[in-house]
Amino acid sequence: LWASYCAPCFQEFSHSQKLFAFLKTNNIEMLYLAIDKDKEITKWHPNIKNNYLEGNHIFTSDQIQESLQQLLNEPDGVYIPRYLLFNSKGELVLPSTKKPSEGQALYDEILSALK
């Protein structure tokens, strides 16, 4: 989960290339959910391109954001940056993982959770 106004999100993006390599090696897909407001949509594509964000991207609607709040039991809004882990069945395994800047600790957490 990220947004165009989130400076910590962009700090984490700087660690993305190593994360992409790990995910590819382990056959794991990346899905980015942008929780920007509609007025920010013009910043969305340039931010994806400028930060070399490989993977799938969704600019979330208000309805999706509400569903995320319910799923994560955070009625006042979800915090970002945030990394969720789902298994191959689409089940939420980790509602909040370590960050890409944590490197190997994140990779170990992912592999352990998907066993």
Give, region by region, the residue ranges found by the protein language model.
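Active-site-proximal beta-strand/loop segments in catalytic clefts of secreted hydrolases
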Residues: 1-3, 33-36, 60-61
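Short active-site neighborhood of thiol/selenol oxidoreductases, capturing the structured segment around
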Residues: 1-10, 16
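Flexible loop/turn segments at secondary-structure boundaries
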Residues: 5-8, 37-41, 65-67, 92-93, ...
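Active-site-proximal structural scaffolding
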Residues: 9-12, 37, 61, 76-79, ...
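Structural microenvironment flanking redox-active thiols in thiol-disulfide oxidoreductases
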Residues: 11-51, 64-70
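Short, internal strand/loop/helix patches
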Residues: 45-80, 84, 88
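Thiol-/selenol-based redox modules, centered on thioredoxin-like
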Residues: 80-115
